[in-house]
């Protein structure tokens, strides 16, 4: 089962669109679920995601026009409970102790957060944490040179194989990270 994880698009305020090389990779009919950390900013960005997969889950980012998106969401995909937050509620941004507390409060196997616009994936106390970064490479308050990235999770039984796609220069680099639920 393929799950696209992305966020912090900031279209059209900070970027015009997804990188063309990412659009070529993201084709309709291949992905079953989309988990978005927010800051899509417009309905057009949401409509684009709906063309890629029928099952789209979004949480509200601090720049989203749609105030109906929830602050947090728990989604079950296969054997995994996945928590989804934007990340602006994590202080300081990306703080491990704050993320671990949210993971415990949501009682999830995987916690997905954004806001920092920098990709990160790691295991901590037998739980898995993913920050897909910014799919467009949109800048944030602390950093101008953001590497565009998104994540594709392949969920099979008690294993998640995470593929991170990063646009470095003109090349899309792919890294593979595996997490087994214990």
Curated annotation (Swiss-Prot):
<comment type="function">
    <text>Component of the commander complex that is essential for endosomal recycling of transmembrane cargos; the commander complex is composed of the CCC subcomplex and the retriever subcomplex. Component of the retriever complex, which is a heterotrimeric complex related to retromer cargo-selective complex (CSC) and essential for retromer-independent retrieval and recycling of numerous cargos. Component of the retromer cargo-selective complex (CSC).</text>
</comment>
<keyword id="KW-0472">Membrane</keyword>
<dbReference type="GO" id="GO:0006886">
    <property type="term" value="P:intracellular protein transport"/>
</dbReference>
<comment type="subunit">
    <text>Component of the commander complex consisting of the CCC subcomplex and the retriever subcomplex. Component of the heterotrimeric retriever complex formed by vps26c, vps29 and vps35l; within the complex interacts with vps35l. Component of the heterotrimeric retromer cargo-selective complex (CSC), also described as vacuolar protein sorting subcomplex (VPS), formed by vps26 (vps26a or vps26b), vps29 and vps35. The CSC has a highly elongated structure with vps26 and vps29 binding independently at opposite distal ends of vps35 as central platform.</text>
</comment>
<keyword id="KW-0967">Endosome</keyword>
<keyword id="KW-0813">Transport</keyword>
<keyword id="KW-0653">Protein transport</keyword>
<dbReference type="InterPro" id="IPR000979">
    <property type="entry name" value="Phosphodiesterase_MJ0936/Vps29"/>
</dbReference>
<comment type="similarity">
    <text>Belongs to the VPS29 family.</text>
</comment>
<dbReference type="InterPro" id="IPR028661">
    <property type="entry name" value="Vps29"/>
</dbReference>
<dbReference type="GO" id="GO:0042147">
    <property type="term" value="P:retrograde transport, endosome to Golgi"/>
</dbReference>
<dbReference type="GO" id="GO:0032456">
    <property type="term" value="P:endocytic recycling"/>
</dbReference>
<keyword id="KW-0479">Metal-binding</keyword>
<dbReference type="GO" id="GO:0005829">
    <property type="term" value="C:cytosol"/>
</dbReference>
<dbReference type="Pfam" id="PF12850">
    <property type="entry name" value="Metallophos_2"/>
</dbReference>
<dbReference type="GO" id="GO:0005768">
    <property type="term" value="C:endosome"/>
</dbReference>
<protein>
    <recommendedName>
        <fullName>Vacuolar protein sorting-associated protein 29</fullName>
    </recommendedName>
</protein>
<dbReference type="GO" id="GO:0010008">
    <property type="term" value="C:endosome membrane"/>
</dbReference>
<keyword id="KW-0862">Zinc</keyword>
<dbReference type="InterPro" id="IPR029052">
    <property type="entry name" value="Metallo-depent_PP-like"/>
</dbReference>
<dbReference type="GO" id="GO:0030904">
    <property type="term" value="C:retromer complex"/>
</dbReference>
<keyword id="KW-0963">Cytoplasm</keyword>
<dbReference type="GO" id="GO:0046872">
    <property type="term" value="F:metal ion binding"/>
</dbReference>
<dbReference type="InterPro" id="IPR024654">
    <property type="entry name" value="Calcineurin-like_PHP_lpxH"/>
</dbReference>
